[in-house]
Amino acid sequence: MSEKNIVLIPGDGIGTEIIAAAKAVCDVAFEKVGVKVNWIDKKAGGASIDAYGVPLTEDTIEACKNADAVLLGAVGGPKWDNVDPSIRPEKAILGLRKELGLFCNLRPVKIYPSLQEYSPLKKELVQDVDFVIVRELTGGIYFGEREEVQGEGANEFAWDKETYSRYEVERIMDIAMETARKRNKKVVSVDKANVLASSRLWRKIAQEKAAANPDIATDYFYVDNTAMQLVVNPAQFDVIVTTNLFGDILSDEGAVISGSIGLLPSASMGTGTALYEPIHGSAPDIMGQNLANPLGTILSAAMMCRHSLDLPQVADAIENAVEQVLVDGYRTGDIYREGLKRVGTTEMAQAVIERL
């Protein structure tokens, strides 16, 4: 029997409930394939501030570094709005990214047939939408040099610097190519090469990687065109790879297109242990009420099985079970429509388990 070590970080708000739901699903799925899991519970975010005075402890960092994967619920909430900015709950995510060397964010956007009505786009536009945004996570303008406001009156100014190195672009392109190879073998590299010098380097390296991976059909879009194409023809995309800034914007656009943010998972990957989490927040207003949608966390666990645990059959089983639950009409409050079966967090997890 193989053995895996997984760090669980519930975090704050609804994090405890959705992590418990995902763990329950995983326990059943792992048992079916004879995998033993050592679950390691750790705190981060506001829960860690309350317990230890900091959002991320060395103990949690070391546990994550030594694990096969990290599954996170959500961090933050108004309770910690007035703490010192240097120890805000969100610093835990940034700290984990840095300590684990996580330079790539994978954001799948899939619209299930049973949820097409939730998209703000017409049904005929969202049929067959199933793509992944590969976002560079540690470079670009978010991490560049900057100068806050200087001067006075009409002469006030501020600036931010966008820089990308060959090394940074090559490694994110490699992940995009490998991701596409496991899917439909199509990559769109997104930049603003008609204006930005950093984007011209980005495109040059993307073209080199395309030549080195002839089995992958590669195209090149400007970011403004990509934003439009995501609205008028989102089904054309398979893998989108782009910079930190552009990926931040486009992945949120993709989330809105889906119409069901509670179902969207994500993965942050790099040189160390990968981190998996749903894209939604900690929703403290519904915590402890068995109202949270656990499917984004359950699907994040499926991504964990596929990318970190080498258990693609478990990932497929979980994803298929989630899709069947939706077909059968089970809905938490955030995606409920009259005539369907309204359930809570634990009931939704149980429905997934019954269909594994």
Can you describe what each PLM-predicted range is?
Residues 2-6:
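Extreme N-terminal starter segment of soluble prokaryotic enzymes
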Residues 7-24, 28-30, 153-224, 236:
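Glycine-rich phosphate/diphosphate-binding loop of Rossmann-like nucleotide-binding domains
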Residues 12-15, 68, 134, 176, ...:
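Buried hydrophobic positions in well-ordered alpha/beta secondary-structure cores of metabolic enzymes
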Residues 22, 26, 206, 297-308, ...:
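Buried hydrophobic packing segments
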Residues 34-58, 228-230:
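N-terminal beta-loop-helix "entrance" segment that forms/cooperates
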Residues 46-49, 230-330:
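Glycine-rich phosphate/nucleotide-binding loop
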Residues 50-159, 245-247:
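N-terminal glycine-rich phosphate/adenylate-binding segment common to multiple enzyme folds
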Residues 138-139, 143-183, 187, 193-195, ...:
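Glycine-rich phosphate/pyrophosphate-binding loop and the adjoining helix
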